Amino acid sequence: MTITAVKIITCVFVFLIGSAIGSFLNVVIYRTPLKQSIIREPSHCFSCGNRLKWYDMFPIFSWLILRGKCRFCGSGISPRYMVMEALCAVSYLGAYLVYGFSWEFAVACVLFAVLIVLSGIDIDHFEIPYWCSITVAVLGIAAFFIPWGASLAAPWYERLISLGVVAVMFVILVLIGGMGGGDLQLMVGASLLLGYRIFPALFIGIVLGAVYGITKKIRDHKAELELTEKIRQIALDWYQEQLDADVGYVLAGRDDVIVGTITGGKPDIEWEFLDENAWKGIPDKSSLSRAIREQITTEREGAFRITIREDQITRVKYSRRMVFGPFLAIGIATSFLFGSQIVNWYVGLMNLS
């Protein structure tokens, strides 16, 4: 058997293993946020409840053969499952082609699996699980002590400097509302693993996220204005009822803010943000939540902010939630495979100029 044939067979093997792991990651993405076991409960159709046969669970191929439908009831199966399986397979194959069977390849397999899981959960639930960020950080800390290959070798001070710079940048972004705490934890953990290569990852993630965010903002602008106006009118009517009822809401010249969220199509008010002294006269605080929930039906995930000044609602602002974890994950994965080449290319470009 020639070397080329062995290489091809090995690539096919790595691809199939990656797709099988991707199938398991689909289970992790769906069940862990719901606190369900990822082992005990067998795979089944969400529509009819029938347990899937073993020949219906071949990664990628079963979805294609079944044409994205359940064998028993014909209900549609989201193509996302196949996409995740293919994504894991391709990422594992890419890691093998870059690093071969090495320590770097082993680290890449763990890292890419974690990145796929956190991306899926972030898309579904707008949060990056703490354990995902911790896993990435553990890989980085292990790099301090384990003599891995040259691609993972970096002085300890380089990793710490990268960590410090990234932490400061992301703390600022979190404080101004540009990113969430999960994004900060992820990039801090990744900086321990990547060292100076975290900066290409950061650049790629921010650029992709910005392009996605701007595109989505332009596309959804009209719908967001309509939703904001609905919330404003409901809040005005509710607040006027409180004033007419003389329930004792007195700001005494102070400002107050009502913060609400829309999660899974269900609007709610985060009352812990309110001034308790100002609002203690209202016997039923949940009346505003009920009013918004009864009159607004939307699948949009977002947050709204109602500003009250001198007994008047002066501003209502709605902003749609945007996931950022998947874009950071793309940046981290790309930088893990090609970060050194990207940095060297950029340095060479600067020298030429």
Where are these regions (language model features)?
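A membrane-topology feature that recognizes alpha-helical transmembrane segments
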Residues: 1-353
